[in-house]
A protein has these predicted regions:
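Glycine-rich phosphate-binding loop
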Residues: 67-80, 238-307
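Short glycine/threonine-rich loop-to-helix capping motif typified by GTGT followed
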Residues: 54-59, 218-228, 260-266, 273, ...
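Glycine-rich phosphate/diphosphate-binding loop of Rossmann-like nucleotide-binding domains
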Residues: 10-28, 159-163, 169-250
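N-terminal glycine-rich phosphate/adenylate-binding segment common to multiple enzyme folds
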Residues: 50-166, 273-277
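N-terminal alpha-helical transmembrane segments of multi-pass membrane transport
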Residues: 5-11, 21-26, 30-56, 64-67
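Single conserved hydrophobic/aromatic residue that forms the stacking wall/gate
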Residues: 314-326
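The feature captures the short pre-catalytic strand/loop hairpin that immediately precedes
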Residues: 305-313, 317
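Short acidic, glycine/serine/threonine-rich loops at helix termini
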Residues: 25-27, 85-89, 143-147, 219-224, ...
Length: 326
């Protein structure tokens, strides 16, 4: 029998290894499903927690820069350490999330799509095609500032401009004790998010929906709406028409109602918190939270394919952390 001709590769992809059980499964996937059939070329980076600690997390930055160079990366699940992990692994410090570091360098948007297979039936009967969630991965409640406010205090929003002038806005006069929260976002980040969404819609030939609550949040959410519309009108409207797809904006509550009634088959762009919640809801309603793809896409066309889940910690007992897996 003639030897199988492997699929050739010209440009290497960036391989980001992970932690614990993912290292075992990723090696099995390569050995059984990839290496016998593909002349695999990769630039390898070990993002295991021990190596991140050994390199003072430089390896994470280096892997992201390599991804910008080659354009494609595959990333395994990694540990974002908490206090218990710092003690367990004897870490120098509580290192940041590798995903957050990579997303910041690549300026990317996370697209998550349910995997539809026979035998797993969506809980919503009308859903026939996948619904892709595009989640803005910067700002909002995830980079907020919070404070407890005592009774009798007054909370104000103060903006100090470059020329030293100040702008104040009253948040609330607290007759009783309460809480406050400050959030922010950046025009540049919203613009990158919008372009990544529009480009992904063109690449996949799917309609793009975007939803906020601009009727209530007339500055914050409205800014998202305005930036999306400006970029669509100026850069993408003609391309969308040629591709036979559409961009559609609506309020977030209306979007939820439309999503439940729809057949699927589109991209739903969400702000950070909305995307965090809705991606889990959509995946679970399709039948399985674990059955979901996740890809980080940059406006310049860089792709990083990652696990849409964390680590299978329960599959690694304490003895197997110290001994070889049999």
């Amino acid at each position: 029998m003639a030897e199988y001709q492997k699929i050739p590769m010209q440009t290497p992809l960036v391989e980001m290894d992970g932690d614990e059980m993912t290292r075992i499964l990723w090696k099995m996937i390569k050995d059984i499903l990839i290496l016998p059939y593909v002349d695999l070329k990769t630039e390898y980076y070990d993002l295991g927690l021990e190596n991140r600690d050994r390199t003072d997390d430089r390896v994470t930055v280096e892997s992201a820069m390599a991804t910008k160079k080659y354009g494609v990366a595959v990333k395994c699940a990694t540990i974002t350490p908490n206090a218990a992990r710092v003690e367990e692994y004897h870490l120098k410090e509580m290192w940041k999330s590798p995903n957050a570091t990579i997303r910041a360098i690549l300026d990317g948007t996370v697209f998550r799509t349910p995997i539809i297979v026979k035998g797993i039936t969506p809980f919503i009967p009308s859903w026939k095609k996948p619904i892709t969630i595009a989640r803005h991965a910067y700002g909002d409640v995830y980079k907020n500032t919070e404070a407890a406010v005592p009774a009798g205090a007054k909370a104000e929003l103060l903006i100090t401009k470059a020329d030293g002038s100040e702008e104040k806005h009253l948040i609330h006069d607290f007759k009783t004790s309460g809480i406050i929260q400050g959030m922010h976002n950046l025009d540049s980040s919203i613009e990158s998010f919008a372009r990544a969404c529009f480009n992904f819609a063109l690449d996949t030939k799917q309609d793009l929906w975007f939803a906020t609550k601009d009727t209530i949040s007339k500055k914050y959410d409205h800014r998202f709406k305005d930036i999306f519309q400006e970029i669509y009108d100026g850069e993408y409207q003609e391309k969308f028409q040629q591709a036979g797809i559409e961009y559609f904006y609506t309020l977030i509550d209306d979007a939820v109602a439309r999503v439940v009634r729809s057949e699927g088959g589109y991209i739903w762009a969400c702000k950070n918190y909305d995307g965090d919640v809705m991606s889990d809801m959509v995946a679970t309603a399709f039948g399985s939270l674990a059955m979901m793809t996740s890809v980080l896409v940059s406006p310049d066309g860089t792709y990083e394919y990652e696990a849409a889940h964390g680590l299978s910690l329960i599959h690694i007992s304490e003895p197997t952390r110290q001994e070889a897996i049999s």
